[in-house]
Design a protein with these regions (language model features):
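Short helix-capping/linker turns of helical repeat alpha-solenoids
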Residues: 5-6, 21-22, 35-38, 51-53, ...
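Canonical positions in the second alpha-helix
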Residues: 32-33, 67-69, 104-105, 141
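TPR/TPR-like (Sel1-like) alpha-helical repeat modules
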Residues: 100, 104-107, 111, 115, ...
């Protein structure tokens, strides 16, 4: 999605407000951009709903925003979708869906996806325990 000059300024200001923990202001700035289909703004909205930052915690809304962002190939949202499916947060718990999304994150080089999937295999969390696969993923992540 191409942003005009004002929208770029709103995005940057919204991200800065989020970083500075001015969650209500971040919501005001990022929400219109998310509604217009901006993937990063959608991801940030998901995180805000997921954690109750500036808005009441709402796992269903978080999953909706995360999926919209992930479907636009926003890489951090791939990890977010994996986490949501792993935990059953806003979606039905589904280890195979979690693996699918974490694998996309791994392909993009996301260390968080590597380590989280490694822990799933190490602990047998929704999957059959596989210490060798866990070790391979941890090495890939630099551990």
């Amino acid at each position: 999605m191409n942003l005009n000059e004002d929208e770029i300024m709103d995005l940057n200001s919204g991200l800065k407000a989020l970083e500075d923990k001015h969650f209500t202001r971040a919501l005001q700035l990022l929400s219109p951009l998310a509604e217009k289909g901006h993937a990063e703004a959608q991801h940030r909205m998901a995180v805000m709903y997921q954690n109750g930052l500036g808005i009441h915690r709402n796992e269903t809304a978080a999953a909706l925003w995360m999926k919209l962002s992930a479907d636009q190939d926003y890489e951090l949202a791939w990890h977010g979708m994996g986490f949501m499916y792993m935990e059953g947060e806003g979606v039905d718990k589904n280890a195979q869906e979690a693996i699918k999304w974490f694998s996309k994150g791994i392909d993009a080089g996301l260390i968080g996806s590597m380590t989280t999937l490694a822990m799933m295999y190490k602990e047998g969390n929704g999957v059959e325990k596989n210490p060798q696969e866990a070790e391979r993923l941890l090495k890939m992540a630099g551990f």
